[in-house]
Amino acid sequence: MKYKLFILACIATLISCRGDNDEKFYTGKVVFPVRPNMGVKEAMAARVVPYPRQLEWQKLEMTAFIHFTLNTFTDMEWGTGKESPELFNPVNLDAEQWVRVLSEAGMKMVIITAKHHDGFCLWPTKTTTHSVASSPWKDGKGDVIRELRDACDKYGMKFGVYLSPWDRNAECYGDSPAYNRFYMEQLTELLTWYGKVDEVWFDGANGEGPTGRKQEYDWQA
């Protein structure tokens, strides 16, 4: 009888240990112990699970990305930064129609190029005159970001912005400290003027600015 009890105790211990091992999950990341062997690494890495916000992002399933800027009127993928704001005059722009159609198509979030590489801003930024404020659209009083934001609110759509770090128009681009401040001011405007922004897209492109210099981005700012 004692022998049977001993065997049962051993089995229970093994099951308990196995259960602890299988149920140990790591959210977002895992920190390995000192000098672990490959088996330990593989076992621990296999139990890393996403953060709750990452799971919520996956549930969005489909997001619309709108590339709309001066390039729309010059038929160029990338602008040069020398285009005149006078070219921007979308007299029939209807952000509500955009969002309504996207919502009907099953999209749950819209992201727009608030600024692409040409440096033209779709909102009346205080950082540069290269924006909608200098265009004939609505006599310089239009704001594409505001109209899209309001349309997203109306249709229950999440809202995001793309802000290109590369700026082919800004004279301070290439003067790393100055442009980093300039860029942070633009990002701050977008994140504080329009309510909740659900997602921000950056870009790894790093070409030359109007002065022929490249920028060292302060990604940790």
Located regions from the model:
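Mature catalytic domains of secreted/periplasmic carbohydrate-active enzymes
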Residues: 21-221
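Bacterial Sec-dependent N-terminal signal peptides
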Residues: 1-24
